[in-house]
Amino acid sequence: MPGIAYLGPEGTFTEAALRALQAHGLIPSTAPDAAGADEVTPIAADSTSAALAAVRSGDADFACVPIENSIDGSVIPTLDSLADGAALQIYAELTLDVSFTIAVRPGTAAADVRTVAAYPVAAAQVRRWLAAHLPEAEVVPANSNAAAAQDVAAGRADAGVSTALATQRYGLEALAADVVDEPNARTRFVLVGRPGPPPKCTGADRTSVVLQLDNVPGALVSAMTELAVRDIDLTRIESRPTRTGLGTYKFFLDFVGHIEDPPVAEALRALHRRCADVRYLGSWPTGDVVGAAPPPMDESASWLEGLREGRP
C-alpha cells in the first residue's frame, strides 16, 4: 500500500483531505496493473516541505499538501518546494470547505485567553473573528492546525485555531465552533508524487507549469501568447523569486486542459522553445471543468494530417 506523507500531526485538514482523496479513488496504486489504492499508510510530517522531501527521498510514495485557499491565496511553502529540488508531479486535487474550532483546555473561558496558537494560513482566515472575540489575545505561530491543539493541550497557549477532530483527539473543548471570516472559505489540496505518466484525460483537467524566463523585454507576454493563440484558459499566474538575485522570478501557471489535448501539447512545446526553463508539474483531473476547456482539434489540424499522409 502506498505511503502518503501529509502535514501532521493527526487531526489536520490535510489528513482529512488525504482521507477524502482515498475515498474518491484518486490515489494511484503502487502495485502493477492496479487502478487505485484501497489502503494507504499515512505518514505525518512537520511541514509541507518535509512532506514533499519525503517523496523525493523515497520515504513516501506521495504527499498530500495544501496549495491554495480562497482567503489567503497560494500556500507559499508548497509552491517553493515544488519549484526547487528534484522534479515532482501532481496527480490529483481535492477542495475542502474549511471552518475552524477555537480549542481550549476544559474550563477555560474567553476572558482567560491571552495567547492563541494558529497556523499562519488559518490565522489569516479567522483574523476578524479573533479581533472581535479575543481582541487582547496574542496570536503565536503553530506548525499546523493540529499542532495548535497540541500547543494548547501542553499549556504552551491558552487557545488554538484548530479542527474539530484535533480538539477531540487532544482532550480539549470548543470555545467556538465553525469559525471562519468568510463562509465560502475553501482550501485546495494536491497529491504529489515522483514524475510518471499523468492520469488519463477526462475533459475536466488542469495543467500546471513553472516557467523561468530570459531577462529580455516582452518575455512574459510572449510566453502568455502561446496560450492565448491556442484558446487555452489561464486560470492562475503567480511569481516567486528565484533566490538567485534581486529581480529574478519564476512564474507558476495553471491552465485548463490536459497534456493529451492537442492545443495544450502544442503550447507546452512552444513554451519549452521560448523559455529558459519549463518545469512540468502535471496534468490531472479536477472533477468539474474550471474555466473554458481547450478547443478540439480543428479542421486545419485534420488538413495538415492529411498532407502528412499524402491526402491533399
UniProtKB/Swiss-Prot annotation:
InterPro entries: ACT-like_dom_sf, ACT_dom, Chor_mutase/pphenate_deHydtase, Preph_deHydtase, Preph_deHydtase_CS. Pathway: Amino-acid biosynthesis; L-phenylalanine biosynthesis; phenylpyruvate from prephenate: step 1/1. It is an enzyme of class 4 (lyase). GO terms for cellular component: cytoplasm. The record marks T187 as: Essential for activity. One of its GO terms (molecular function) is protein homodimerization activity. Residues 291-312 are annotated as: Disordered. GO terms for biological process: L-phenylalanine biosynthetic process. The keyword tRNA processing does not apply. It catalyses: prephenate + H(+) = 3-phenylpyruvate + CO2 + H2O. Residues 3-194 form the Prephenate dehydratase domain. PANTHER family: PREPHENATE DEHYDRATASE P PROTEIN, PREPHENATE DEHYDRATASE-RELATED. This is Prephenate dehydratase. It comes from Mycolicibacterium vanbaalenii (strain DSM 7251 / JCM 13017 / BCRC 16820 / KCTC 9966 / NRRL B-24157 / PYR-1). The gene is pheA.
